[in-house]
Amino acid sequence: MRHQKAGRKLNRTASHRKAMFANMAASLITHEQIVTTLPKAKEIRPIVERLVTLGKRGDLHARRQAISQIRDQDAVRKLFDAIATRYASRNGGYLRIMKAGFRQGDNAPLAVIEFVERDVDAKGAADKARVAAEAETAEAA
């Protein structure tokens, strides 16, 4: 019996699940919106909500706790500088999950998870900078 066993296994080992959630949390903080399957979105929501609360605390111990959880310095910097100040007056409920139909290949239910008051320009900003840099080097060569 699996009474009182909270959380989804998502057909992964514990270490794979932990790494996947760390990567998804870093991506969500960086881009402020990601598309994933509905069960993964429901599992990542409380993790990122706790990270935003750590960012609102803002002290060194909270920063180190966030780094130990998502292991991405740039994402933690954005979390503590931009996102935490944006949600300073909000007590929880930083994310929304919207259903986004079904995936073509396996009919898995998809969802968009995003910050409630997100920065629209943040999505894909890193990719735009990378593409611009590649185009610049191509012109120079």
From Swiss-Prot:
Keyword Isomerase on entry: no
Pfam families (UniProt xref): Ribosomal_L17 (PF01196)
Gene Ontology CC annotation, any one: cytosolic large ribosomal subunit
Domain of life: Bacteria
GO biological process: translation
Alphabetic keyword roster: Ribonucleoprotein, Ribosomal protein
InterPro entries: Ribosomal_bL17, Ribosomal_bL17_CS, Ribosomal_bL17_sf
Molecular functions per Gene Ontology: structural constituent of ribosome
Family stated for the protein in its record: Belongs to the bacterial ribosomal protein bL17 family.
PANTHER family: LARGE RIBOSOMAL SUBUNIT PROTEIN BL17M, RIBOSOMAL PROTEIN L17
Protein name: Large ribosomal subunit protein bL17
Name of encoding gene: rplQ
